[in-house]
């Protein structure tokens, strides 16, 4: 395919148009008075959302250069979402500000490399300053406040706080769709381990890229499965029972993996293969834990068992299994309660005997997975459209809350970024490096400015007053009042704010140092009508 090239100013201006189109669509959602964006969905009802990364992912522009600019900002939202799980709109607003301001200076003759050095220096100081003003999340109420601010809903904050209280800060919390109108919290027995499906073709929900299995059989083995013939007799029994199967093995590869995927795609049966968790002796112990939790028998050479001789009564069962790219969660395993209690007691005895802190930690993890549970927030709504929107908000709020527990909280509503303005402005630099620092200084004000504008106010007036306010005092756009943000519970997780700033600066610096852009030229469509009977097309 032929390529088209643009250089220097032409290239950057073309990409900037794409940056602005995407950022302008996303930034209308920021703050308590932010608006929603309606996304067209093929073959289903439109999605109404205020989730930055969801909006960003939907945007595909016709002009290839503009599209590349949009994709760069999309990357900011994606990375921030991956690391912190929230703050994608803030990251987008920061990136747009840095790119716009940086491009003005490059056009005026500034050296992009000098600007990049200044941006990097300013962001480093800003992150240190954020950690200095960060406060630990210490109680259930503070956890609820973080969730409530992220979701703009106090009820959601309360559910997340209760869920974390029941399964622990590091416990497993899943979000499901309810059949009713009300949102409810349930705690189900469950186990999660860090292994995902071995092929993306095993997913049952291609939008979320997850595999959900209802009442599956569970095969637990420490063997490698390479030949499909080894498991064919067992799979035939599973097909007759009309139930899905989760295969947990040392490895599923070759002919076995190929045939599982092919049969899954043909609809013959639903099977998901995952690698066994852990390594060495720990793997063996974790497989035994899983077998006890689900009522399975581990198919292993140690017991003289072969896969081809396995039957349904050797398999475990659970009410539900959810498998993502990286994790497998088994909910409501149907193992014998007495066996589970005995296993927990056995592991606790090992904890008492070991002197190694690392071993203690791993053993405690296993106890939590066997004796702990999975909290399930069941989301209810009056319509499908509202349900999807509410579910996205709860997912963001949960991620935000986890981030807050991990790194603490700072004043919300963009206040913390303006609070560290003074510290960043004290950086000693000259020339283009100083200009790079100033680019970050202007960007630190952008989220507050946009929140105010979304509330129908003049952003620059709010920013100027905030610069001279006491630390922690900020503008509550929901009530149009100046309050102590931390006391009012208007907070942001430090991790979310930090990630947004880091990723925005990284992409902005790459953008400003771009000197050439290469785009594919689309092939012209052939509109010529085919001739009849092998004859050339008629004029």
Curated annotation (Swiss-Prot):
Keywords: ATP-binding, Chaperone, Cytoplasm, Isomerase, Nucleotide-binding, Stress response
Molecular functions (GO terms): ATP binding; ATP-dependent protein folding chaperone; isomerase activity; unfolded protein binding
GO terms classed as biological process: protein refolding
Matching PROSITE patterns: CHAPERONINS_CPN60
SUPFAM superfamilies, sorted: GroEL apical domain-like, GroEL equatorial domain-like, GroEL-intermediate domain like
EC main group: isomerase
Catalytic reactions of this protein: ATP + H2O + a folded polypeptide = ADP + phosphate + an unfolded polypeptide
The enzyme's E.C. designation: 5.6.1.7
Subcellular location per the Swiss-Prot or TrEMBL entry: Cytoplasm
Residues the entry annotates as binding ATP: 29-32, 86-90, 413, 476-478, 492
Gene Ontology CC entries for this record: cytoplasm
Disulphide-bridged cysteine pairs: none
Family: Belongs to the chaperonin (HSP60) family.
Quaternary context: Forms a cylinder of 14 subunits composed of two heptameric rings stacked back-to-back. Interacts with the co-chaperonin GroES.
NCBIfam families tied to this protein: GroEL (TIGR02348), PRK00013.1 (NF000592), PRK12849.1 (NF009487), PRK12850.1 (NF009488), PRK12851.1 (NF009489)
Function: Together with its co-chaperonin GroES, plays an essential role in assisting protein folding. The GroEL-GroES system forms a nano-cage that allows encapsulation of the non-native substrate proteins and provides a physical environment optimized to promote and accelerate protein folding.
Protein name: Chaperonin GroEL
Source species of the chain: Staphylococcus epidermidis
Name of encoding gene: groEL
């Amino acid at each position: 395919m032929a390529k088209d090239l643009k250089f220097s100013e032409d290239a950057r201006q073309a990409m900037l148009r794409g940056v602005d189109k995407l950022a302008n669509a996303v930034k209308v959602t920021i703050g308590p008075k932010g608006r929603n964006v309606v996304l067209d969905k093929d073959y289903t009802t439109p999605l109404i959302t205020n989730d930055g990364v969801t909006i960003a992912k939907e945007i595909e522009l016709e002009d290839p250069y503009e599209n590349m600019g949009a994709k760069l900002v999309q990357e900011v939202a994606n990375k921030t979402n991956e690391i912190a799980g929230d703050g994608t709109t803030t990251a987008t607003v920061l990136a747009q500000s840095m790119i716009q301001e940086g491009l003005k200076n490059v056009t005026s003759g500034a050296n992009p490399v000098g600007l990049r050095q200044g941006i990097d220096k300013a962001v480093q100081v800003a992150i240190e300053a954020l950690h200095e003003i960060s406060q630990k999340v210490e109680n259930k109420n503070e956890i609820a406040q973080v969730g409530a601010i992220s979701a703009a809903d106090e009820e959601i904050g309360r559910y997340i706080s209760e869920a974390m209280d029941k399964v622990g800060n590091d416990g497993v919390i899943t979000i499901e769709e309810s059949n009713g109108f009300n949102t409810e919290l349930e705690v189900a027995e469950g186990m999660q381990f860090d292994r995902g499906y071995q092929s993306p073709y095993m997913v049952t929900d291609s939008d979320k890229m997850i595999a959900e299995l209802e009442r599956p059989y569970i095969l637990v083995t420490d063997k490698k499965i390479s030949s499909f013939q080894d498991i064919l007799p067992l799979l035939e029994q599973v097909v007759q029972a009309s139930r899905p199967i989760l295969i947990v093995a040392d490895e599923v590869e070759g002919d076995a993996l190929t045939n599982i995927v092919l049969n899954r795609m043909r609809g013959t049966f639903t099977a998901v293969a995952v690698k066994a968790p852990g390594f060495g002796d720990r793997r063996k112990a974790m497989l035994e834990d899983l077998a006890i939790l689900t009522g399975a028998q581990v198919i292993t050479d140690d017991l003289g068992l072969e896969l081809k001789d396995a039957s349904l009564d050797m398999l475990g069962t659970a009410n539900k299994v959810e498998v993502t790219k990286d994790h497998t969660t088994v909910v409501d395993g149907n193992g014998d309660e007495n066996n589970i209690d005995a296993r927990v007691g056995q592991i606790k005895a090992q904890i008492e005997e070991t002197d190694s802190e690392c071993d203690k930690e791993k053993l405690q993890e296993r106890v939590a997975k066997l004796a702990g549970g999975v909290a399930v927030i069941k989301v209810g709504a009056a319509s499908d459209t509202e349900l999807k929107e509410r579910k996205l908000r709860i997912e963001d709020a949960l991620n935000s809350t986890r981030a807050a527990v991990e790194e603490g909280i700072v004043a919300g509503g963009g206040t913390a970024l303006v609070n560290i303005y003074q510290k960043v402005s004290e950086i000693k630099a000259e020339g283009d490096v100083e200009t790079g620092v100033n680019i970050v200084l202007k960007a630190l004000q952008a989220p507050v400015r946009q929140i105010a504008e979304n509330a129908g106010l003049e952003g620059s007036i709010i920013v100027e007053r905030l610069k001279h306010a006491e630390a922690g005092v900020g503008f509550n756009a929901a009530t149009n009042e100046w309050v102590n943000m931390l006391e009012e519970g208007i907070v942001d997780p430090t991790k979310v704010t930090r990630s947004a700033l880091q990723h925005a600066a990284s992409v902005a610096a790459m953008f400003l140092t771009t000197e050439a852009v290469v785009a594919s030229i689309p092939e012209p469509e052939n509109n010529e009508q085919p001739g009849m009977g092998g004859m050339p097309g008629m004029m």
